[in-house]
Amino acid sequence: MHRIATKPGDLDSEKKLESVRQTPADILFISTADTELSVLAQVWGKRFQKNARLTLSLMQAYPLQHPAGAEHYADNVLCKAKLAIFRLHGGYSYFPHMLDEILHIKSHGAKTRILVLPGTDEWDPELMNFNDYAEPLVRQMFSYFHEGGIDNMELAAEAVELLLELSLIHI
């Protein structure tokens, strides 16, 4: 059953629905920053290609602002991942549908572990409502991306591997 609003005026007519075609993967990284996605493709792509047990998929976040795009992504890609990391510029006010979809799939038994980070320099406490991890860990991951650089992306990749190992123990 679809969860998108059907009342006139409920959809933002300014936002065009972009079809989201992404193959499910073990690790999803969704960001509003193209440069960040480019660096991760280099650093994480090499690292996770070596580990044949894990697949990685990177995606630009903006198509997930549309309610139908967010719902489709949650139902067809997100719920099949082991870990999904979102780095969202604008937080809940820019991505309410996607963040609500996270709560929806989790309430229906999705085992995907979720890490939602601010996409700006400012800490956003509201995003903690969507995280499966404690605030100190979320802040540490936020610092890796806030500071940027190859070394921090390597540290973030190590943390991702550890989070996945811990997830397997607790599932």
Predicted feature descriptions by range:
Residues 169-171:
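Conserved small/polar residues in nucleotide/adenosyl-binding loops
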Residues 11-16, 41-42, 68-71, 96-104:
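Short alpha-helical segments and helix-capping/turn motifs at coil-helix boundaries
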Residues 2-47:
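N-terminal basic/disordered segments at the start of proteins
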Residues 99-152, 156:
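Hydrophobic or amphipathic alpha-helical targeting/insertion segments
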Residues 72, 83-102, 114:
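Cofactor-cradling patches in redox/metallo enzymes
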Residues 20-24, 51-52, 76-80, 107-109:
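Flexible, charged surface loops at secondary-structure boundaries
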Residues 29-35, 61-64, 87-90, 118-119:
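Structural motif
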Residues 7-15, 48, 52-76:
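A short, well-structured beta->alpha microelement
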